[in-house]
C-alpha cells in the first residue's frame, strides 16, 4: 500500500468534511470522542503549516493537526482510519508535524490523548511522551442546578481592559506574561467569543469567556485571581453565565476544565455539569 502525506496551511471545505467523516468513523470504531477543534481548523491563518493529511486509495485515511496558542508548545491531535492502522501512517504524520514545529522554534508538543484510547497511550509510551495533566469535557445537564447568590457583577470587557485580562491570565493560570500576551493576541477578534470580567467592590478579580453559535456555547478562559479564590466568586460567576445562556435559549452548554484529579470537579458538578469525556495530555520535547 502506498500513501501520500501533505502539509496544509489552510483546509478546503472538502477536506474539512473528510476530516469530520474520519473522526466519526474512528469514534464509532473505538468508542471515543476525539478532540480536533473543528472551529480552529476552519479559521487557520494560512501563515503556517499546521494540518497534515494522508491519502490512500483515493480517500483521507489519516489526519494530524497542530494547535499553537503560544510559542512554548504545540498541542497535537490526530487519528488514522481503523482499516489503515499499523502501517506507519501516524508516525509519518508526526514526523512532518515535528519538523514544522522545529522550523518555527517551538520546543515541544503536547499530545491530546483520550482517556480510554489504549493505542494513544501505547504510542506515548513508545515515543517517550510524559504525562502532564488531564482535562475533562463537561456538558450541562437537565438536572436541578444549585441556586447561587452573591455580590459578583459580570461586566463585558472593553478595550481598556486588555492589561487587566493579561494580569488575570498570568495569575489565574500561573502563566508567563509573554505567553499570556501571545495567547490573548491569537484569540482576539473572534466574533463568536465574549469575555466578562468578574467585579467585586469595583475591582476585577476574575474573568470568564464564552464562544457561542446557533447550536452550542463553550465556556473557557475561566479564572479567579488567587487572592480571591475560595470565596465562592467563581461559583457565582459560573452560575450567572449559565443562567444567561439558558435564558438566551442556547441548546447545549459545555466547558473543559484541567484538574489533577476528578474530585476537583465539584464546582462544575454543583452547577449542573457532568463529565462527558476526559483527555490526558502528554509532553514530547523536540
Regions found by a protein language model. Name each.
Residues 1-38, 148-177:
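Short amphipathic alpha-helix that is part of the acyltransferase structural core
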Residues 76-78, 109-112, 219, 253-257:
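Conserved hydrophobic beta-strand within the GNAT/NAT acetyltransferase core sheet
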Residues 182-248:
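Glycine/small-residue-rich hydrophobic helix-like segments
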Residues 81-87, 212, 225-227, 231, ...:
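Active-site acidic-Proline motif in GNAT/NAT acetyltransferases
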Residues 8-11, 27, 31-101, 113, ...:
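Conserved donor-binding loop and adjoining core beta-sheet/short helix segment
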Residues 86-99, 126, 221-224, 230-247, ...:
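Conserved acetyl-CoA-binding loop-helix of GNAT-fold acetyltransferases
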Residues 70, 82-150, 282-284:
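Acyl-donor-binding surface of acyltransferase catalytic domains
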Residues 136-158, 251, 256-262, 277-286:
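C-terminal "cap" of GNAT-fold acetyltransferases
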Amino acid at each position: 500500500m502506498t500513501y501520500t502525506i501533505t502539509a496544509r496551511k489552510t483546509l478546503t471545505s472538502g477536506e474539512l468534511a473528510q476530516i469530520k467523516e474520519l473522526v466519526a468513523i474512528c469514534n464509532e470504531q473505538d468508542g471515543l470522542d476525539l478532540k480536533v477543534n473543528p472551529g480552529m481548523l476552519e479559521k487557520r491563518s494560512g501563515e503556517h503549516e499546521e494540518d497534515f493529511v494522508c491519502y490512500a486509495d483515493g480517500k483521507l485515511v489519516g489526519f494530524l493537526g497542530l494547535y499553537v496558542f503560544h510559542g512554548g508548545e504545540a498541542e497535537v491531535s490526530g487519528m488514522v482510519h481503523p482499516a489503515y492502522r499499523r502501517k506507519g501512517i501516524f508516525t509519518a504524520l508526526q514526523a512532518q508535524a515535528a519538523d514544522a514545529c522545529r522550523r518555527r522554534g517551538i520546543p515541544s508538543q503536547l499530545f491530546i490523548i483520550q482517556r480510554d484510547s489504549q493505542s494513544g497511550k501505547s504510542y506515548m509510551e513508545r515515543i517517550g511522551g510524559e504525562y502532564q495533566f488531564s482535562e475533562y469535557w463537561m456538558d450541562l445537564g437537565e438536572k436541578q442546578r444549585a441556586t447561587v447568590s452573591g455580590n459578583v457583577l459580570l461586566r463585558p470587557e472593553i478595550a481598556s481592559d486588555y492589561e487587566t485580562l493579561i494580569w488575570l491570565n498570568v495569575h489565574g493560570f500561573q502563566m508567563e506574561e509573554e505567553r499570556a500576551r501571545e495567547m490573548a493576541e491569537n484569540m482576539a477578534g473572534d466574533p463568536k467569543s465574549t469575555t466578562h470580567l468578574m467585579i467585586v467592590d469595583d475591582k476585577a478579580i476574575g474573568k470568564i469567556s464564552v464562544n457561542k453559535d446557533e447550536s452550542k456555547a463553550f465556556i473557557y478562559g475561566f479564572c479567579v485571581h488567587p487572592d480571591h479564590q475560595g470565596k465562592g466568586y467563581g461559583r457565582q460567576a459560573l452560575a450567572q453565565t449559565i443562567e444567561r445562556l439558558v435564558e438566551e435559549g442556547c441548546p447545549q452548554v459545555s466547558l473543559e476544565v484541567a484538574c489533577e484529579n476528578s474530585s476537583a470537579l465539584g464546582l462544575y458538578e454543583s452547577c449542573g455539569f457532568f463529565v462527558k469525556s476526559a483527555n490526558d495530555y502528554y509532553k514530547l520535547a523536540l
